[in-house]
C-alpha cells in the first residue's frame, strides 16, 4: 500500500468513524487490519529517532507497512481490539496515526526529491 492510497483510506476511515460512533466495537472488528497498519505507522513515526533520520527511512517504512517486520506489541494490540474499554484510546491513536501518515508522506516526497538531486546519500 503506497502513501497516497493510505491517505485516501485514512480520509475514508475518518468518515466512517464519524458515521459509526454508535457501533464502535463492530467498526474496529471490521477494519482490524487497516487499524493495525495505522498503528504500525504510529510506531515507526514515534520511534526514538529524530525526525530528520526518519525522513531517510522510507524504504524500511514501506517494508514495515507491508508486513515485512513485526513487533510483539501488535499481539497485545490485537487483544485490545477485542476489548471495548480500549476503543477510545485506539480512536485517539487512529487520529494521531492519520496526522503522522500525512506528515510522513510529505517528508517522504521531500526526501525523494533530495535523493534525485543528489543532495543526500541513500543509506543514512
Curated annotation (Swiss-Prot):
Completely overlaps MDM31. This is Putative uncharacterized protein YHR193C-A.
